Structure formats: structure tokens, C-alpha cells
């Protein structure tokens, strides 16, 4: 990965130039924010998310999105009809789940935390180790993972094809011919591309509503962009560089550590490195890190404030931050201001696809 200390310093929010009056928080004055400079690699900045494009050769439609949503919430994709995509990526839990690691078929536990589906459309690579290059490729994986859905693609297709409602819906979307695993993955991915956190207090602030953030949240934004070094990895509209970093998270089993990205690349520099998750909606989905070892935002920020853990391959960006209690509190407040206020994303109601079986 190499050092990225020599980074471009750029202005992020011109609208901040007007915020010159000192803000007061209780008895403590918050320094005025006149301009926020963020060190980021290249011409990137944090801000509102851009529209999501469909992949070449796979145009989307309302019918395809609806079909994908039905499949996403349908446990028929699993071998014993108990696990759906939403079992581990629940909209009520920030499109993740509440356990340190995900739970699959027969109650088996995986080795990693469920990454969020929200804003996954912006990830250049999927999974914590980046082994899938697209949402479509990612959607195929859990179906035949023995711990997650424990099925085979062939058996799953047979089940779906024998459900009358699905047969007619696949025909309407994809035309004549047998249902394929690629079509299943394509439909699920089309739905997942609609799970975008397009609105938050932060987004409203960036769009010009200067009252959208409190004084404490503005202080947290300043820390996020400055002393907290958060934008070294959490930059861009999705607050993620899409890259892989070793944070020094202690191995739960030192004799059999999770090697992360190294398992895919075999590059020694990737040993113990995991993908940077988005900070958007992070407050909705504890616990944190790839193994769920930090139970709250407060403990997560303490972890970063210490400079991460100890590891021979620790990312050079991981350094002690020296944040005060007030600064940590402000950082938590800002992260919470990144929660989506869009009900189409935050309050998605699960579909019970039983109607397809009638």
C-alpha cells in the first residue's frame, strides 16, 4: 500500500467559510469553523453520494428491483429455508446484524462481522477481503457457503424455478429460458444498488443547511477531517477509500489468525489487512471491526485513539491520536449525524414472498 502521508490538502466545503462565529457548547466554546481542509489522496472529498449507475449490459428496471428485493428477503435461497440475505444484512440493524460475527445455517457462526449492504454499490470490491469484484459476484457467494446458506447453486435454482410466482417474474424480467444463478445474482444486485443512504444531517449541512449540525457535531466534523486522521482512510462520498488496512486487531485464535486480504493477493503487505467500511450509518450497526470486537462507537474510537493494536504489519497510518474526552464525544456525535434519514433506506420493510407460492 505504501505511505500516503504526502496527500493533497484541499477545501471540502466552501459553505463552511460563512461559519465564522464561535459556537458555544455548554460552558465550553467551540472554535469557529472557517474552512475545513481535508488531507485526501487525489481529487476526492467527503460529501453527498453521487447516483448509482447500472453495470454495462445489465440495465435496471422496477420489475428487476422488485424481484431482487423478493429474493433478498426469501430464505428459500438457503438449503433448509431458514436463512435469507436479510438474516445477516438486516435493514433494521443498519443493513448488517447485531452479532460480532454472522450466523448462518444450523446456527453456525462465521469468522467475520457482516458488512453492510447499504452503499455497497460504491465499493470497488466486495467482502472484507475484497474477493468479489461486483455485487453480482458477491451475491452468489453466500448461497453455496457451507456456513451461511449451505446450498448449491443448482439446488437453489431448482427451488426458485419450482415456485410459480418466481417463474413468471423471471420471465417478465429476463424473457424466455431457464432461470440461472446469474439472473438471481443480477436481480439481487439491482435491489442492493437502491440501498443508498442519500440523506443525513451531514448531507443536509453540505447542501447548505447550516443549522443541520449542532455545535458538537460540527466540532466532530472538524476532528474527523483533522486531528482524528479519519479521512486518511474514510474519504470520498461514501467515507471509505475502498482499500485494505491492517489495524492491529488482535487475532481471536493466534494459532490460526484471519489473514484478511492476504488470502486473496498473497502479497505480504496485505497480511491482516481488511477493507475500510463506510462510516455512513455506522452508529446503527454495532459492534465494529471485521471481527466485531469493539462493542460501541466509544470503544472503537478509543481503539483508534490508542493507535490501534500491535502487529508487525500495522498500517503506518495507525498512530496515537491524543484525543480528549470532549473530542471523542464530538467525534461520536458527528458519526451519528451520518445516519440516513431517508425512510426508503432506513425503514425498508421486509417482503414475505409467500404470495409467490400461491
Protein language model regions, located:
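Sec-dependent N-terminal signal peptides
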Residues: 8-14
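Periplasmic c-type cytochrome electron-transfer domains
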Residues: 2-7, 19-358
